[in-house]
Every structure is written in structure tokens, then in C-alpha cells.
Design a protein with these regions (language model features):
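Sec-dependent N-terminal signal peptides
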Residues: 1-2
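N-terminal Sec signal peptide cleavage junction
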Residues: 8-9
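Short, solvent-exposed loop/turn elements at domain surfaces
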Residues: 13-15, 40-41
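A structured, mid-to-C-terminal "fold-capping" secondary-structure block
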Residues: 16-19, 129-252
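Post-signal-peptide N-terminal segment of Sec-exported extracytoplasmic proteins
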Residues: 24-54
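A small/polar active-site loop signature that marks catalytic segments
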Residues: 61
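Beta-rich strand-turn-strand
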Residues: 64-66
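Mid-length scaffold segments of soluble, non-membrane domains
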Residues: 69-147
Length: 252
């Protein structure tokens, strides 16, 4: 998330009126962004604010842990697909520990054992496999993506244990649990969303450039080698850097 914020804060609108090579569908993407932002401001944000205000922090952490644990098979799957065999076994053990000792993931009992949380997904896997980024996309009601990352949305969904909850639980249970997961996710984004609103000259570009930089950061596990940036996305990000730093200091 720090990469998202630092990238977005440094973004200004390009003065060149030509089509952006990383975002050739910008006109359509902006419409999707505006629609999603409207829904967020009028529906999700007020609910998330109430959640943050009235739900105690320890309970929020446990709820977040629970949903992270439900989604963790996706991390394990992509560990192995990327050839990170040791990390895959460590994450498998983390999942087992938190599911059992951690009471279904409500408590992160694995971290004190040295089994730290990782962030892997199918979009990163495709990047590791050498698939080009492709054009930027903004998926309505979901958020920023790229042609390469888009298939990962489906993989993340079907590898989430909540996807299969309907097989052994009624809709009266699955529905509220799903809604709570959406609220939890939005609540975790409240801080970055406020920074976006306060610091970004163009919120759309803030989200886009921050997302692209964050994805590059994740694919290279936080250490991207400059000589490896032959992806058009890197050229675009380089062109998007501001000419000077803000005189008031860096915004984070």
C-alpha cells in the first residue's frame, strides 16, 4: 500500500494529448472509475466509516485475519506456480496453524512462529512467467487492473474458501459473511482513500500510477532490477515522474 500511495502522490496529468500507451482505453476507464467512485462515496464509504467507528479495533483485526485466511489458498497456489517451493510450504503451514490454533483464522498464531504473511496472486505469477503487462484496465466495482492481472481476479475468487461456502451453508449465512468481507476490505482502504482525496490533483491518475508501481514492486518481491524493465509500463512510469519534488516535502 505504501507503494500505491507514494506512486500516486507523485503523479500529475500528462500534458501530451496523445493516447497513453499504457492506458489506450482511458476514456472508458475513467467512466468506470467515476461510476465506482460514486457507488463508493454513497454506499460503501459511509458503511465502512460506521464500521471503523463502532467496531473495536481488536475485533476489526480478527475479522480482517479471518478473511485473509479464507483467501490464503490463493497465495499458496501462486507460491508454487512461481517456483517458490519453500515459501509455498511455509505458507501452507501458516494456513494450517491459523485455521486450527487460530480458530478459523481469527487470530494470527503463525506470525509469532516465524510464518509471516506473503502477498502472491496469479497476476504476479503471469509476470514471473514473462507475460507482458498489457493495457491498464479499471474494472467496475472491483478496481484497477491490467490485461495481465485480470485473469487473477477469477483465480482469486475460485481459490477463496468463501466461494465454496454455499455448498455447506445457507444463503442466510453466506450472504452476510460476504457483505461483511466487502465492508472489511473497504474499511482497510479508508486511510489510502483519504490520502488520495487530499493529495491527488487527478484521483484517477493517482490510482492508476500507484497501482502500476505497486504491481511492479510485488512481481519483483520489492527489488526490481532496473535492467529488467523492458516492459512498456516501465517507460510510461518513467515518463510520468514529476520534474521536481514538492517544496513542502513528500506526501505519504
Amino acid at each position: 500500500m505504501c507503494a500505491l500511495l507514494s506512486g500516486g502522490c507523485a503523479t500529475t496529468r500528462p500534458t501530451d494529448a496523445s493516447v497513453d500507451p499504457i492506458d489506450p482505453n482511458e476514456k472508458t476507464n475513467r467512466k468506470f472509475y467515476d461510476f465506482t467512485d460514486m457507488v463508493d462515496r454513497n454506499v460503501l464509504a459511509p458503511v465502512a466509516d460506521a464500521y471503523i467507528k463502532y467496531i473495536p479495533n481488536p475485533m476489526q483485526r480478527s475479522i480482517g485475519n479471518f478473511y485473509d485466511n479464507l483467501a490464503y489458498p490463493n497465495v499458496i497456489l501462486n507460491d508454487f506456480l512461481q517456483g517458490k517451493v519453500r515459501q509455498g510450504f511455509e505458507d501452507s503451514l501458516r494456513f494450517v496453524v491459523n485455521t486450527t490454533i487460530g480458530l478459523g483464522g481469527l487470530f494470527d498464531m503463525a506470525a509469532p512462529m516465524g510464518l509471516l504473511q506473503h502477498d502472491e496472486d496469479f497476476g504476479q505469477t503471469l509476470g514471473v512467467w514473462g507475460v507482458n503487462t498489457g493495457s491498464y484496465l479499471f474494472v467496475p466495482l472491483i478496481g484497477p487492473s491490467t490485461y495481465r492481472d485480470a485473469p487473477g481476479i477469477g483465480v482469486s475468487a475460485v481459490s477463496n474458501l468463501l466461494f465454496y461456502a454455499g455448498s455447506f451453508a445457507s444463503a442466510a449465512v453466506v450472504g452476510p459473511v460476504t457483505v461483511l468481507g466487502i465492508i472489511d476490505k473497504r474499511a482497510r482502504l479508508s486511510g489510502p482513500m483519504r490520502v488520495r482525496d487530499q493529495a491527488a490533483l487527478d484521483p484517477y491518475l493517482f490510482v492508476r500510477e500507484g497501482f502500476l508501481q505497486q504491481r511492479k514492486h510485488l512481481i519483483y518481491d520489492g527489488d526490481p532490477p532496473p535492467e529488467s524493465f523492458d516492459d512498456p509500463m516501465y517507460e510510461e512510469l518513467e515518463q510520468s515522474k514529476p520534474i521536481t519534488k514538492s517544496s513542502t516535502g513528500s506526501a505519504h
